């Protein structure tokens, strides 16, 4: 996911995406703790996606 893709979306859609990514992050962390996650770098990617969405949201609010 690139910031350019997020820039064109509206606030409601960004908030929906943020909620989905946060729930996905929770699931991946749970899998990590129970030793079911095969690729721990997925957590890093999801965290960066959340940061991009938050940046796009704050840019829209200004």
Swiss-Prot record:
Pfam families documented for this protein: Ribosomal_L29 (PF00831)
SUPFAM superfamilies reported in the protein's UniProt record: Ribosomal protein L29 (L29p)
- Which GO cellular component terms are attached? ribonucleoprotein complex; ribosome
Which one of the record's GO molecular function terms can you name?
structural constituent of ribosome
Which CDD domains does this one have? Ribosomal_L29_HIP
Keyword Zinc included in the entry's annotation: no
Coiled-coil boundaries: none
Supply the alphabetized keyword list: Ribonucleoprotein, Ribosomal protein
Q: What GO terms describe the biological role, i.e. biological process, of this protein? A: translation
Under the heading InterPro entries, the entry gives: Ribosomal_uL29, Ribosomal_uL29_CS, Ribosomal_uL29_sf
Question: Which family does this protein fall into?
Answer: Belongs to the universal ribosomal protein uL29 family.
Spell out the protein name for this chain: Large ribosomal subunit protein uL29
Question: Native species of this protein?
Answer: Helicobacter hepaticus (strain ATCC 51449 / 3B1)
């Amino acid at each position: 996911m690139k910031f350019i893709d997020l820039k064109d979306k509206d606030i409601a859609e960004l908030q929906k995406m943020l909620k989905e990514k946060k729930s996905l992050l929770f699931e991946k962390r749970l899998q990590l703790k129970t030793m079911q996650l095969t690729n721990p770098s997925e957590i890093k990617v999801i965290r960066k996606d959340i940061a991009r969405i938050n940046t796009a949201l704050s840019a829209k609010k200004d």
